[in-house]
Amino acid sequence: MQIVLQVSIPQLKKMAAYYAPYAVSKAPKGAVFVAKLSQATVTAYKSGKVLFQGSGFKVEAARWQDNANQPTQKMNASHVTPGATIPTDFANWSVIGSDEVGAGAYFGPLTTAAVFVSKNDLDWVKALGIADSKTLTDAKMRDIAPEIIQRLPHHVVNLLPEKYNALQPHNNVNQLKAISHNFALHKVLEKIAPITPDAILIDQFAQATTYFNYLSKAQQSPVIRQNVYFTTKGEQYHLSVAAASILARVVELDTMVALSHEAGMTLPIGAGKAVDLVAAKLIRQGQDLNHFAKLHFANTAKAKSLVN
């Protein structure tokens, strides 16, 4: 089962950064990268064609389909449709939404936030102008985040590099995401008890069965599974996910400022060449990358090669 998308070169660069944690060292001729996830393999070519294969190909392709031309090839006539499982009128429900940032960035944390937006707060949240949180500037998010924090029940899991690096050898990136989402959701449920939300919406990064398998494997307790929905582009289906996305992003930005201050230099976001150069500089200065970066990224080896 597979699908091929045609994307622009700028979009291809974004995808390369996003999949950097999953990249393998060997790629076929003409390929920019090959990323192996638990349920899918993504192969991107210099031509802008990106091949998604495996049982989770739909979920992975859905992340990028809005910014791609029509698929050039599809198997089993499967169409990737974000939100296909979301009930009618879901946007008007009382929902806890969760989202994460930082998984594709070498420096900085993996940050996950969950926010409860009740029916009574929907109009207030709409007035903040966060419906399409992905288009907001960092400055605008910084303005909005304090209002969300003050009014809406929320919880943020900010997995700093040292903790991330301690956990990562025993948990793949998606498993760390699942653990963080589940913990954040549990904390918000505790805060709003005895109120129960109509639903929980997780911005999807894995198939539902895979997500719950991750939590079982990690022996998480309790596992939040009642009325849980998954979809990519979750912010388009409920404002709670948009609010969570903003909180996660602002906490990530604040953490990057703090880490940059400790490093004595600006730590770039992403996983490109600029990141390699800064990591190499940190090594030359005798600073510990474990404190600043996700060490399993290919950037670590690249930085060391620049030093040697």
From Swiss-Prot:
Catalytic reactions on record: Endonucleolytic cleavage to 5'-phosphomonoester
InterPro entries (alphabetical): RNase_HII/HIII, RNase_HII/HIII_dom, RNase_HIII, RNase_HIII_N, RNaseH-like_sf, RNaseH_sf, TBP_dom_sf
Domain RNase H type-2: 93-308
EC numbers: 3.1.26.4
Positions annotated to bind a divalent metal cation: D99, E100, D203
Intracellular or extracellular location(s): Cytoplasm
Major location (coarse): cytoplasm
Single annotated GO MF: RNA-DNA hybrid ribonuclease activity
Alphabetic keyword roster: Cytoplasm, Endonuclease, Hydrolase, Magnesium, Metal-binding, Nuclease
Membrane spanning residue stretches: none
Annotated CDD domains: RNase_HII_bacteria_HIII_like (cd06590), RNAse_HIII_N (cd14796)
Job description of the protein: Endonuclease that specifically degrades the RNA of RNA-DNA hybrids.
Protein name (Swiss-Prot/TrEMBL): Ribonuclease HIII
